Amino acid sequence: MTCAYLAFTDTGLALAKRLAAALPGSVARCGQDGTSLAEWTGVQFVQSDALIFVGAAGIAVRAIAPHCKSKTTDPAVVVVDECGRFAVPILSGHLGGANDLARTIAAVCGAVPVITTATDAHGIFAVDEWAKHQNCMVLEPERIKLVSGKLLAGQPVYYWTDIPVTGTAPAGLFPAEAPEKADLALTLCPTGQALHLVPRIGVLGIGCKRGTSAEALEAAFAAFCARHGLAAQTVTAAASIDLKQNEPGLLSFCQAHGWPVRFYTAAQLRSTPGQFTPSPFVQSVTGVDNVCERAAVLDAGGSLFYPKFACSGVTFALACRPFAPDWRWQNG
């Protein structure tokens, strides 16, 4: 987590430096070296994962107000009084990690973490915080309040999962009979009106003809996702053979999705263990019988989830990194 600290007095600056020694980040003092509150907040809101104001909560609230957009994208914001007595998360408590950060800051300086989110106050399951710690994306953040609202009202919440989850489900959660009857679903392939948590574990293996455009790859990817009902958000990286490392279309396609793409030699791909879909033509061109499946599995270090899919000169396969969700996670 990239932290940025802003203090307003000498006392606050000393505390900010103390916190930064334990939780590294940039430290600035308002009014010093040309630092203005508005400019600092605007820059750090975009560049940092967490903003820590060492001063009054009112100042922080007014400073961040023009920049707040969405609980899925806003950074964590924590306010610490300059005497180090209280650490108060005021933005992105769960998805942004502000609640956890406030607890950590409190442990460093001896403050009291002031956590005001309802689920934490009542000691019940916080689905968005759990999702963050399980490396899952919340597809429909507007549905978080529906799940939390049921739990707060003492009503049952029914969940569906395609993936085994270690431990016993938290109080108030019960397995659903079918995905369509779930309030909450942990899956790579969302259906129905549940709040869907999508594990960020997928690696997309790519094969393509020379000169394939980014637009052609995008169309093929849409068809691949539609074929399997796959949430595109599960993909976090891409992989292919080194013969494709200078393909403009492939590079642009991956960049547009924010995926790092790694390239492997034919020898590396051949040595990847597993059962793969062979192609004599691919073998003759690349020196290995399959590119997309082997590249995905090699890069993921896990298992093949969806095998080779061909569309207009493009081949895709999906492999998943090891993933072990656990109900037993809870705040320290």
Question: Which positions does each model-derived feature cover?
Answer:
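Short, structured coil segments at secondary-structure junctions
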Residues: 23, 109, 256-257
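N-terminal basic/disordered segments at the start of proteins
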Residues: 1-29, 307, 312, 319, ...
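Class I S-adenosyl-L-methionine
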Residues: 2-15, 24-65, 252, 268-286, ...
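Conserved mixed alpha/beta catalytic, RNA-binding, or beta-rich assembly cores of soluble enzyme
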Residues: 12-18, 34-36, 44-99, 104-108, ...
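Terminal alpha-helical anchor/extension segments at protein ends
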Residues: 199-204, 220, 288-332
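C-terminal non-catalytic interaction/assembly regions of soluble proteins
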Residues: 237, 241-296, 300-304, 310-314
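Short, basic, helix/turn surface patches
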Residues: 107-108, 140-148, 286-299
